Amino acid sequence: MMQESATETISNSSMNQNGMSTLSSQLDAGSRDGRSSGDTSSEVSTVELLHLQQQQALQAARQLLLQQQTSGLKSPKSSDKQRPLQVPVSVAMMTPQVITPQQMQQILQQQVLSPQQLQALLQQQQAVMLQQQQLQEFYKKQQEQLHLQLLQQQQQQQQQQQQQQQQQQQQQQQQQQQQQQQQQQQQQQQQQHPGKQAKEQQQQQQQQQQLAAQQLVFQQQLLQMQQLQQQQHLLSLQRQGLISIPPGQAALPVQSLPQAGLSPAEIQQLWKEVTGVHSMEDNGIKHGGLDLTTNNSSSTTSSTTSKASPPITHHSIVNGQSSVLNARRDSSSHEETGASHTLYGHGVCKWPGCESICEDFGQFLKHLNNEHALDDRSTAQCRVQMQVVQQLEIQLSKERERLQAMMTHLHMRPSEPKPSPKPLNLVSSVTMSKNMLETSPQSLPQTPTTPTAPVTPITQGPSVITPASVPNVGAIRRRHSDKYNIPMSSEIAPNYEFYKNADVRPPFTYATLIRQAIMESSDRQLTLNEIYSWFTRTFAYFRRNAATWKNAVRHNLSLHKCFVRVENVKGAVWTVDEVEYQKRRSQKITGSPTLVKNIPTSLGYGAALNASLQAALAESSLPLLSNPGLINNASSGLLQAVHEDLNGSLDHIDSNGNSSPGCSPQPHIHSIHVKEEPVIAEDEDCPMSLVTTANHSPELEDDREIEEEPLSEDLE
């Protein structure tokens, strides 16, 4: 069937290629023969057609064979990668039609062809068969050659891959050998030079010692200047008559440098050797105009330790300036020993207008000594910072007075006096004990979030103020109905933005905050996790130490009866019983012992303090004024002005706080410098601050949120 279809396609194509001219001519000849013999016209025409078709098929086959022979001779040279599957297709296309014996008999019977023509056809067929055999043999040879070439190429590729792998292995081995040799060399060097590391460590230690010596000299010079300025201030106050010195004491001698094994000449020589360029003379310091006060903490790049810093014994200074100075020195030395600095934080220099990035503390010290040395630019920056501090302290004193007036208005009612309790004296005239002068007072450390207002000392002996000298003003507790309708958010809401961004502990108890969280919700009920999320969302302080304050929240929820646990679809939720909450607040004031209630006039304020406050007061004792009858109504205003000039924090002095002339103080009276406590009381019985205690009756009001449970992390 394949051969027949091939012959048909070849005949059709040859007829289309050669045209219809030959066919038409033979048809014309057949028609002429048919005219002569009409009986055999149809037979002749069919025989001629068959004969023509066979001839055309043979011619087409010969042409194809010739073309393929020429292309076959060129193909092995041009395209060696020819596929062997193309060979049988071309052979099948070239196979001509073979005449079967049956077809021969039919042709003889019909007498279409003569015997000569048949012989010619047979010869042609034999020639075609020979050509086909030759072509098949040729194509077989080509296929074998292609297979051989492919095999050779594959072998070459495998050999190349093996060679590459061998080269890579050799390179890896060489690298390993080099690394081993380097390690051996390093080990040999370490064995040969064991003292190199020790030398490097010694060099680092020497550099650190040089930096420490440089900072020590600078600190000592600053201390000298501060002492001189303090002496000038005290002399000016003495001339004005505000401070009097007992006759047994000298007139404020100038403190010399500490005896740390170095004389002033040696210290000056050491300073010149360390700095090299910036040689500092005493005259240069005086004419340089460097004005440093005790409150300028930014210019004090101190690195003194407890061994190097001298125990300075200051004399009577207005309202606790000496203790503040000592506290700052102690805190600065503590920060230096802990590899920290006031001017260094989060890898950035905090010098005003600098903000240079320092990777470690050593690099910061180099930057500080190089860029911020004692020159005109640093001196000018220091003066600007002093002015900033002065303005802020003036603003702070004004705000404190405003707060005091607000608290006086809110918590005291002069129209309804209560004669039994006596308010605390604001200013008392005391004499300084010699034993107190020998030991330098230690002040409590200050924090930025707890503003300290040193309050004038309170005697432990008989009260200096008589009932006639002070108006009998008591605090009348307001009823709950006065403030029952005012929402709690009116006290917390104004400070939301501050507490949301600043890491400051809010001045409210856990109970108050939990109640506020529940009251702010839409359905007045919250789950425990929702309360936690309200705390962290509202206050930046609660975004750390989660475990501690969460325990305190759970403790408050289970402790107080005003918080009710309700089971619903969401689970366990907490609600607030407002009546129980208000009842609890009233019981808290009436049931707890007051601080100064029913104290006889023969007892001092120290006898009524609780244990925790007494311990705090014992640590922060400071002598103040030294003569009775010194402060009067006229001098209170002068003290206020002096307090602003000294950058201090003198509290507002009541004009009625003059001492009674009839009472004389005892010879040995311990004056107490009280650090103003943070807004949150450390104990329920403790007052929220000494300002409120001094301005109010001991019966503290019940509607102050801080009087409730302390907001401390100790509740677990």
From Swiss-Prot:
A single GO cellular-component term on record: nucleus
Keywords: DNA-binding, Metal-binding, Nucleus, Repressor, Transcription, Transcription regulation, Zinc, Zinc-finger
Polar residues bias (residue ranges): 1-28, 316-325
Residue numbers spanned by region Disordered: 1-45, 286-340, 439-466, 650-669, 679-716
One Pfam entry name: Forkhead
Binding region for DNA: 505-595
SMART domains: FH
Keyword Transcription regulation (UniProt): yes
Region: CTBP1-binding, residue numbers: 423-427
Subunit structure: Forms homodimers and heterodimers with FOXP1 and FOXP4. Dimerization is required for DNA-binding. Interacts with CTBP1. Interacts with FOXP1. Interacts with TBR1. Interacts with ZMYM2.
Protein name: Forkhead box protein P2
Lineage: Eukaryota, Metazoa, Chordata, Craniata, Vertebrata
